[in-house]
Amino acid sequence: MRNLGSKKSLFMKKIIQTSEAPAAIGPYSQAIESGNILFVSGQIPISPKEGKIVSTTIAEQTEQVFSNIEAILKSAGYSFQQVVKTTVFLTDMSHFATMNEVYKKYFTENCPARSTIAVKELPQGALVEIELIATK
């Protein structure tokens, strides 16, 4: 853990990293835990084993994103039931319904707050990226 402020600060952060999800492709962590809150960086559909985008379909890409997120959540001792906020980035809003079909497999009741944002493009040509916040 690292102190985020002065000596008087109570805010600490723990870097979460797992080989079960793709390594960060830039200067950021897979996730950061501060107190009882977990901040998961945006995940794109990179296979951690192959190191590349898994598919060209939105359904398969969304499944891979959730697989990556699940690995990060588990490595930090969290589950999908503890997610309180998600942000979904789509390169094409016509993919919204298909992404939603996959999304609702992971959030069946007591769904987290969510924003869905259309973006021009995502890293490595991904069609979807999802970031989230979970709490214990």
How would you label these PLM feature ranges?
Residues 2-11:
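Short, Lys/Arg-enriched N-terminal segments with co-localized hydrophobic residues
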Residues 11-136:
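Short, polar/acidic, helix-capping and beta-turn segments at strand->helix junctions
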